[in-house]
Amino acid sequence: MKQRTFTMLKPDAVKRRLTGEILTRFEKRGLKVIAAKTLMISEDLAKTHYGEHSDKPFFNDLISYITSGPVFAMVLEGDDVISLVRKMVGATNPKEADIGTIRGDYGIDTGRNIVHASDSEESAQREINLFFDETEFCDYELPDEDIIYEEP
């Protein structure tokens, strides 16, 4: 089933010049980037985005970190993309993430774990709406899309 998900490369990924390398991983898996931008997240946007963690002891550090530098936000589209991206990203703690996952290969610690990926369809839609307007989406066909989404 074709889906959309929100994925964000955090300041540690952008500052370490990993954006292109990570983006390439998603594209090589057949995912389509339909919206993307580099931005500085405001404190208000950060608090809204991470609101579910507002009662956790790490919340203030998370807000400080995510607003400390640029992020690369994107909307990815593909077959069962939410589950696929979560597998590619790996465990929240890079020390527990499998080698070959983005966090396993590039993450430093739980606080600087390179990437955020939506964990459900509801989260994906909410996060996409927070960061993007419908006018920012590019709808296009990939050369192999007819094969990927061919009905059996």
Curated annotation (Swiss-Prot):
One of its GO terms (biological process) is UTP biosynthetic process. ATP binds at K10, F58, R86, T92, R103, N113. InterPro entries: NDK-like_dom, NDK-like_dom_sf, Nucleoside_diP_kinase, Nucleoside_diP_kinase_AS. GO terms for cellular component: cytoplasm. It is found in: Cytoplasm. The active site is at H116 (pros-phosphohistidine intermediate). One of its GO terms (molecular function) is nucleoside diphosphate kinase activity. SMART domains: NDK. Its cofactor is Mg(2+). Keywords: ATP-binding, Cytoplasm, Kinase, Magnesium, Metal-binding, Nucleotide metabolism, Nucleotide-binding, Phosphoprotein, Transferase. It catalyses: a 2'-deoxyribonucleoside 5'-diphosphate + ATP = a 2'-deoxyribonucleoside 5'-triphosphate + ADP; a ribonucleoside 5'-diphosphate + ATP = a ribonucleoside 5'-triphosphate + ADP. Its main location: cytoplasm. Major role in the synthesis of nucleoside triphosphates other than ATP. The ATP gamma phosphate is transferred to the NDP beta phosphate via a ping-pong mechanism, using a phosphorylated active-site intermediate. Belongs to the NDK family. This is Nucleoside diphosphate kinase.
